[in-house]
Amino acid sequence: MLDIKLIREQPDEVKRRLARCGVDGAVVDQVLAFDEQRRRLIYEVETRKAERNTVSKQIGAMKDPAERQAKIDAMRQLGDEIAALDRQLAEVEEQQRAVMLEIRNLPHPDVPDGVDDRDNVVIYQEGEERQLPFPARPHWELGEALGIIDFERGVKLAGSRFYVMRGAGARLQRAVIQWLIDLHLEQGYQEVYTPFVVKESVLWASGQLPKFRDNLYRDEESGLWLVPTAEVPLTSLYADEILDASQLPIYHVAYTPCFRKEQLSAGRDVRGIKRGHQFDKVEMYMFVTPDQSYQALEKLRRDAEECARRLGLPFRTKLLCTGDLGFGSTKTYDIEVWAPGVGEWLEVSSCSNVEAFQARRANLRYRPEPGAKPEFLHTLNGSGLGLPRTIIAIMENYQQEDGSILIPEVLRPYMGGMERIGP
């Protein structure tokens, strides 16, 4: 959520930055109109409360019963007016908040202008689009031939966009998750194991609601929601708390399965495991002071890149343009790995600084020094990495002509020393 003070003091600047992301500035005028109503109502409530206090004092000094009763009646009338104004104020505040929750974050000045992902800028690349000395097979062919991905039984169990990992495939999935977590511990993160379901308020705090409601799974009876990413529970880990500056920065890493309805157009990524309703992801999350946040973003990016580097996968890093920037983000890097079987770069990490956007929603604050007024934290999040696209890249880059798949060296200790998944 944006800072109402910024909207009040610099409405034209807020409109200009929103326009870079294609957002109509009329929403700013709407917020300001509600804000004017709110401030007027607050003034009227306070004025009447002051009048009521004056009348109350006068009643105590009155001796004439008729005059005293008239003042009591006047005080009751003021009380009724205050109650009515309070109801109006609550309604206006709710309307203003509803509008503000729909407004995206403002892009950082470094973010390039653009319409969609075609305008994203490659800022770093390590490795080339690997060409194998034999016809590269896509992961779904490799997986079915080796018996490590079972699409038919996944559909039987849960419907389309679900699959089963079996044998060495399931073991590879578990190995990648464990290795990623261990790498991030080495990089200075603390592991957190969160619930995989959350309250609705937690989704509002992270910015998933209201925008992405139709993409989320919810249990109607309990009112709990399945997490679409570990970012959601991690955002609210310290909600409504005031941290000491000495506790910051806080770096967390968490593994969760992720659940998304993700309505896809027919024919798009229909084969394989690239897009599914359930997938695994290891998430990095940072709580930092405002002066640390852009240095923290560079660390987040480096830590995600290191995952691809140690796995021996060709990768590149893109700076997202305004047209492809996420709802809550001010600046985002995407890390993509090359997959020769499908012949495309696959996004395995998206590293974003959201500044105080989530902190305002979740009421995440810190005290800069003892006795100082609490301020909002900045938060950052990044995949480290997302599966199954990492699995796709491993399978397709490490495939052999005989259909077997070599295990990257860093993963072998996590697979009991296994070096190859063979027919």
Curated annotation (Swiss-Prot):
GO annotation terms (biological process): selenocysteine biosynthetic process; seryl-tRNA aminoacylation
Subcellular location: Cytoplasm
Catalytic activity, EC: 6.1.1.11
UniProt cross-references to CDD domains, sorted A to Z: SerRS_core
EC class (word): ligase
Binding, L-serine: T229, A230, E231, E283, S383
Chief location bin: cytoplasm
Chain sites annotated for binding ATP: R260, K261, E262, E347, V348, S349, S350
UniProt entry tagged with the keyword Protein biosynthesis: yes
Catalytic activity: tRNA(Ser) + L-serine + ATP = L-seryl-tRNA(Ser) + AMP + diphosphate + H(+); tRNA(Sec) + L-serine + ATP = L-seryl-tRNA(Sec) + AMP + diphosphate + H(+)
Pathways involved: Aminoacyl-tRNA biosynthesis; selenocysteinyl-tRNA(Sec) biosynthesis; L-seryl-tRNA(Sec) from L-serine and tRNA(Sec): step 1/1
Membrane-traversing stretches: none
Entry's free-text remark on domains: Consists of two distinct domains, a catalytic core and a N-terminal extension that is involved in tRNA binding.
Family, as annotated: Belongs to the class-II aminoacyl-tRNA synthetase family. Type-1 seryl-tRNA synthetase subfamily.
Function: Catalyzes the attachment of serine to tRNA(Ser). Is also able to aminoacylate tRNA(Sec) with serine, to form the misacylated tRNA L-seryl-tRNA(Sec), which will be further converted into selenocysteinyl-tRNA(Sec).
Protein name from the UniProt record: Serine--tRNA ligase
